[in-house]
Amino acid sequence: MSERSVSKRTEQKRWYTVQAPEQFDREVLGKTPAEEPDKVLGRTIETTLGELTNDASENNTKLTFKINEVASDSAYTEFIRHELTRDYLRSLVRRGSSKVEAYITVLTTDDYRVQIQPVAVTTKKADASQEKAIRRTMIDLVRETAEDHTFEQLIDSVVEGRLSSAIYGEAKDIYPLRRVEIKKTTLEARPEEVAAEEETAVDVDEEDVDVEA
């Protein structure tokens, strides 16, 4: 392809300003080019919490958003993932300490399915029963939080550190803790996707029922 053809195609593309969701104050995430608005939909963009808040101490928190709406020259996004950097997570663990993790899938009050991965780091080596008790506390608190939070409220609780602080407050009585963090949060399914899965499950169950003549 000639340089002129490439240049012409580039000129035909339109630039869209990508914005964070309203809960992140519609902060500008960047710009993305496309020939048609539909080609912008589904694109993802990663940033850090520090870039959104102008606080360098938050640069260890990565946020990923997905474009789900385009209007005029603006591309709007939804939150799909929160994750702490590997370097930061490694810095939490000291020799002779224990790292306790859990993987919890929850449903918010507005029917978003989310997986949350908390991690607790102890000051010294904990035994198996103590690790189990800490993990149980993490699971219970994450589930309780999801049961009375909308998706937006739950993400705010994670990103702002309230959920990890609540876990720390409960679990530190089991064994001294150095730190509790939410390692990763992932949007697994939206309400319409959850409803479709439930409908499919019901259809399958009905097909499995034996009807006696």
From Swiss-Prot:
GO molecular function term, any single one: structural constituent of ribosome
Pfam families: Ribosomal_S3Ae
Entry-linked PROSITE patterns: RIBOSOMAL_S3AE
Gene Ontology terms: biological process: translation
Signal peptide: none
UniProt keyword terms in alphabetical order: Ribonucleoprotein, Ribosomal protein
Listed InterPro entries: Ribosomal_eS1, Ribosomal_eS1_arc, Ribosomal_eS1_CS
Biased composition (Acidic residues): 194-213
GO cellular component: ribonucleoprotein complex; ribosome
Region entry Disordered, spans: 189-213
Family: Belongs to the eukaryotic ribosomal protein eS1 family.
Alphabetized NCBIfam families for the sequence: PRK04057.1 (NF003142)
Protein name per its UniProtKB record: Small ribosomal subunit protein eS1
Native species: Haloarcula marismortui (strain ATCC 43049 / DSM 3752 / JCM 8966 / VKM B-1809)
Gene name for this UniProt entry: rps3ae
